Amino acid sequence: MENAKMNSLIAQYPLVKDLVALKETTWFNPGTTSLAEGLPYVGLTEQDVQDAHARLSRFAPYLAKAFPETAATGGIIESELVAIPAMQKRLEKEYQQPISGQLLLKKDSHLPISGSIKARGGIYEVLAHAEKLALEAGLLTLEDDYSKLLSPEFKQFFSQYSIAVGSTGNLGLSIGIMSARIGFKVTVHMSADARAWKKAKLRSHGVTVVEYEQDYGVAVEEGRKAAQSDPNCFFIDDENSRTLFLGYSVAGQRLKAQFAQQGRIVDADNPLFVYLPCGVGGGPGGVAFGLKLAFGDHVHCFFAEPTHSPCMLLGVHTGLHDQISVQDIGIDNLTAADGLAVGRASGFVGRAMERLLDGFYTLSDQTMYDMLGWLAQEEGIRLEPSALAGMAGPQRVCASVSYQQMHGFSAEQLRNATHLVWATGGGMVPEEEMEQYLAKGH
C-alpha cells in the first residue's frame, strides 16, 4: 500500500497504527447488535444448524466403527469442558489483574480423529459431500444405517472422486484423514507455515501433500485452481464455505447441553464470555454463530489473533473485510501460531458475523508460549501455541471499564460470569515438538 493511502487509512482508523507496530491490541466492537438484529446478515438459520446436527447423527454409527476412538461417544465427535482454577490464579498473578467469574477450557485440542477444532468443520464437510454423492447415485437413503459406507462397494464408489483443500495444517489433517478413510483420493495444499509432523501424518494416511513456499492464501488459491480442472474433484473452500461453517456451528447446542449437565447457568445475571482463536475465520465464526443461537444475547464472543496475523480485526475494523490483507499494511504474517497464520480474512465470515462479535484482540507469539507453559505447569494440559490465543481474553475484558459500561455489566454480573477459552489444537503434537514449545515459555 503506498504511503498516501496508508496515511489516510491510519487517519481514519488510528488503531491500524498499533497493528502495524505489532502492539498487542484490543478492539471492543461498537457495532454489536442483538441476535435478532444481527441474525439476518448471516444468511443461515437455526434450521441449517439443525440439519447439520441431524447429518452428524446419521453418520455416527459409521464414525463409531471407522474411528474406534469415537466408539465410546457413539460416533459423536465432541470435546470435554473443564474448569481450570489453577490457571486462573496463575494468570491473575502474572498479569496482576483479577478475573471475575470462573475460567473454563473447551478442549477441542483433544477432539478425536484429528486433535483440533477442525475435526468439527472439516470432517463434517467431507461427510456432507460423501452423503450427497451416495444419495445421488442411489446407493444410500437417509434411513439407512450409514455404517454400510465401510463396505468395499462404497470404498470403490468413492475412489472415483477426489477432494482438495488448502491449509496451514489442522484443516488439512481433518479433511485428509476423513477423506482417505471414506475412500476419496485427497490432496492437501499446505502453506509454508505447516508443521512437518502434520505433513508426515497426512502422508501416512495416503494423502497427497503439495507444499508451497508461500502463505495460506497461495495454498488455497492453488488448491482451488487444481480442483477446477477435474470435474470429479471437490474443493473445500475454507474462505467461503457455508458447509464448513455449519459443521462448526453445531458446537453451540452441544456446549449448551454440557453446561446443563454441569449445572452451569447462562442468563442476563450470569453472562458467558467466549474467546476463540481466529485464522481465516470459518472455525470461530461458525462456533460463535452456534453459540449465539444457543445462548442468545447472554453470550459474548471475542476473536483472538497473533500480532503478526491480525487479518479479521483489520478487515472488520476498517470495513474492508477481504479487500485488505495484513501484508498490505506491511505486516509479515509470520507467527508460531501456524493455525492462525492468515493474512486475508474470510469476507463471508467477517460480513456475516461483524454485528454478533463483541471484540477482537491480538497477542504476541511470546505471550502464547508463556501461557502454554503456565497451563502445562498448573493444569497438566498441553496445547499448541495457537490454542492459547483465547487465554489472553479474560484479562482484557475484566480490565476494560469502557467495555463493561458499553454493555452495562454490573460488578455482580461479572462475578457470576463464565469465561470460556476455546482450545483449538495440540492434542496430537509429537512429544519432541511439545518440549520445544515448552522451552520457549517464560
UniProtKB/Swiss-Prot annotation:
This protein's UniProt keywords: Lyase, Pyridoxal phosphate
Catalytic reaction(s) noted: D-serine = pyruvate + NH4(+)
Gene Ontology molecular function terms on file: D-serine ammonia-lyase activity; hydro-lyase activity; pyridoxal phosphate binding
Gene3D superfamilies in the cross-refs: 3.40.50.1100
GO biological process: D-serine catabolic process; isoleucine biosynthetic process
Protein name: D-serine dehydratase 2
UniProt similarity note: Belongs to the serine/threonine dehydratase family. DsdA subfamily.
Superkingdom: Bacteria
Matches recorded under Pfam families: PALP (PF00291)
Residue ranges of coiled coil: none
Required cofactor(s): pyridoxal 5'-phosphate
Subunit structure: Monomer.
SUPFAM superfamilies in UniProt: Tryptophan synthase beta subunit-like PLP-dependent enzymes
Modified residues (N6-(pyridoxal phosphate)lysine): K118
EC number: 4.3.1.18
PROSITE patterns: DEHYDRATASE_SER_THR
